[in-house]
Design a protein with these regions (language model features):
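A conserved beta-strand element that flanks and buttresses the S-adenosyl-L-methionine
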Residues: 146
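A short, conserved alpha-helix within the catalytic core of class I
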Residues: 154-163
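Conserved N-terminal segment of class I S-adenosyl-L-methionine
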Residues: 1-138, 178-208
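Hydrophobic adenine-recognition pocket in adenosine-nucleotide-binding enzymes
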Residues: 150
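Conserved acidic residues
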Residues: 81, 143, 169
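Conserved beta-strand signature within the Rossmann-like core of class I S-adenosyl-L-methionine
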Residues: 168-179
Length: 208
């Protein structure tokens, strides 16, 4: 297993245990801050470093659940060569895919702390994905697209879902795991993939 907490502690230049502890509580601070930023979500995602900590914990939990092993297995099984990581956060899904030889396009909010950290991680792991920003429009086909924990943050996710459907056969997404409560007020929309995709396995969906 990759020690994601160790990487973040190295990046922040802070104590490992302190960094790990902040990862466990970052979601509370994010929920608290939302009231200030709810009318300007882009600023929310751009300015706070809390998402680095929250996403590190999230990816660590996926790693513990063997989801990363499954993700790389699916890449190998299907022989995918090029993928898109929408709202790629700390870059873990991009790194995992590129470890298996996939060419990746990574998208995140320009000048955000998550993008800054992801770029540091890409360099640390010796990979060079194509990095684009939040205004990126999907205009080419991909073997697969990753949209884990992304669409619920969009005010209107339907155009993005339609673009994904047009440009890939395979989608990684987790709508059945999403929560809508006081702890995640930044989840501002609900969506239904079933008109466009069929659920295949765990987080994997196939275009209808």
């Amino acid at each position: 297993m990759r020690d994601l907490y160790k990487e973040l502690a190295e990046y922040m230049g802070r104590n490992y245990d302190l960094v790990k502890a902040r990862c466990q509580t970052a979601h509370v601070e994010l929920a608290w801050l939302w009231e200030k930023y709810k009318d300007n979500p882009i600023a929310f995602y751009r300015e706070t470093d809390l998402y680095i900590f929250a996403l590190t914990r999230y990816q660590y939990r996926l790693q513990e659940a063997k989801a990363h092993i499954w993700y790389q297995y699916m890449i190998k099984k299907h022989g995918w060569k090029i993928g898109l990581d929408i709202g790629g956060g700390i870059g873990e899904q991009t790194i995992l895919a590129m470890e298996k030889g996939v060419k990746m396009v990574y998208t995140d909010i320009q000048d955000s702390r998550t993008l800054e950290y992801a770029r540091w991680r890409f360099k640390r792991h010796g990979i060079k994905p194509w990095v684009v920003f939040e205004d990126y429009k999907i205009k080419r086909d991909f073997d697969f697209i990753n949209a884990m924990d992304i669409l619920e943050h969009l005010e209107n996710p339907k155009p993005v879902i339609k673009a994904i459907h047009k440009h890939t056969e395979w989608l990684f997404c987790n709508p059945d795991q999403l929560k809508y409560n006081k702890w995640v007020p930044q989840h501002i929309s609900k969506f239904d993939l079933t008109k466009y995709f069929k659920h295949i396995d765990l987080y994997l969906w196939r275009r209808k």
